[in-house]
């Protein structure tokens, strides 16, 4: 009996087939060829080349390290999966479920709100050991409103597990997190979860991953039974069945493949070899020559293709039923890269941001990235990924972004909301530091180099709320809470409405903002009144317009004089920058000292367009000429000239209003499809996809966010409570002429009543 221990233990040896003994069946012979293999099942050592004895000591240490994330669509079971991983690796000694059914809640959901709602809000970090491998795990949120947590996790990880639901399949947030993995070039394995659920269909989900995610993927396992008959898994690489015994599935028993499944196993292993050979030359040669492929050769090929991001191996199981988690852990260490197998780059600020390859050596200069901030019990907690060098408790380090020199007072390794003090951390490790003032995305070095890591992609907020404390005595705590939330979360913004004087909070959706209002009440004892959610419209221009404005004030005392000439034009579609300013003045028509004031004036004017008072974006301003006065010109005069010049030419540039458009995915019983589709059309949505999944219709549509308020209630009413939907931000696009006229009239009316 093969047994997976719940704590680090010597590698398990399994003798699978022998060259001097025939395979147990014709199918097994076809699948495996004749070979003799003793496998270290947990470590995947068959995939390792013989190491050079002269390799530095730290490379061997890093070979045994994995930095992985677990990402998925909401409610796909990723926190449940992480709970099992922690149990089987000996990190926790009993399993607790999501939603705190047992009064405790999952270990990685450390916030009370997370345990009550059964969702992950923040990304929790933990460290565990699987056999002789050290694994850092980030458990990330699945709800689209918390997508920045996923971005921050993937930025610093070397590999990831994409969890897919065997019933729900590839859903909208599955597509989003997969796109984020591509952006940060993160190799991944997929885990099709919930095979015990009614309607489980892993092969449908695999085909969806190939079609919707464009995954070049194949299953490395076949389930033995589905739904209530799900019993175990067949490993297609080693052609062996595994069953999960014990009260928590901790005993993994190797057995024979059921006779009625040999045909399916043969087909699926052949499909696996063929799929991998399409992206791996070594395996392709054996496949084309019709040579038998051993388990070791197949495992090596899968590892090469996965690390090169050419292949996604697909594992299966049911985390809730404690089946399939240990083989998935073996897949993590076998197929996902160690830190020294990933190319990481920094930008040298002393050399025009030239790309510098980071070796990962602890002997090199310290380079570390702050990827998450959190207010802990003992002050601000900063999560760091060390890319090169060593960071030690008591060291002085430099924040390259601010130039500040900071001492490291305390260094810890995180385990959800618990921590362990450590003395030092080497390249490749993820740790947390207390008492460092910085922003998310800042780079730290030891001062010998001036490197920065590329910044993380931070999406713009799409929704705002007016919020104010019920009691005036709560003002101090109210401000303290908002300041903390802003530092922790780059997508949470706080501003002041200049007209009403109200505090405005902005974020990625209703749930995102509701969570922060609730956290304010719980953590800071501040009750707040909340206004109606408002969409974050924007404005832009559609054509070039000239400006020539003279700001002149010379009626006694110090005068003001400044003239600016040039033009405004829209930026090309897809531009990264939202605002560009270019000074093309030849000569000294305007002294160079006044140019920054002119740019500041245009930026200030663009903060509030004249249509509905929202920010103007995708705008390029070119200054071509101007005039100054020897006595009366000043920074203020030129700033005012720029503000008035922008306002005067804005109408001539044919401005339009942009609104956030959401990608909405609905899953409804087929009998309600017509009603739901008709309602989407009434909301000015455009249906872009309509698929059938069993008795359900899956509708994909682009719908203006402004028309989606209260949609949950409407959908429940239309589908007798059987419909569900998700939505995520897609883009800002121009509103229709009719809607623009309505918005402009409403804005003008509100201004008139002030």
UniProtKB/Swiss-Prot annotation:
Record has Protein biosynthesis as a keyword: yes
Origin superkingdom: Eukaryota
Biochemical pathway: Protein biosynthesis; polypeptide chain elongation
SMART domains for this protein: EFG_C, EFG_IV
Pfam families: EFG_C (PF00679), EFG_III (PF14492), EFG_IV (PF03764), GTP_EFTU (PF00009), GTP_EFTU_D2 (PF03144)
InterPro entries given in the database record: EFG_II, EFG_III, EFG_III/V, EFG_IV, EFG_V, EFG_V-like, EFTu-like_2, G_TR_CS
Xref: Gene3D superfamilies: 3.30.230.10, 3.30.70.240, Elongation Factor G (Translational Gtpase), domain 3, P-loop containing nucleotide triphosphate hydrolases, Translation factors
Tissue specificity comment: Expressed in cotyledons and adult leaves at the same levels.
One of the record's GO cellular component terms: mitochondrion
Protein name: Elongation factor G-2, mitochondrial
Gene that produces this protein: MEFG2
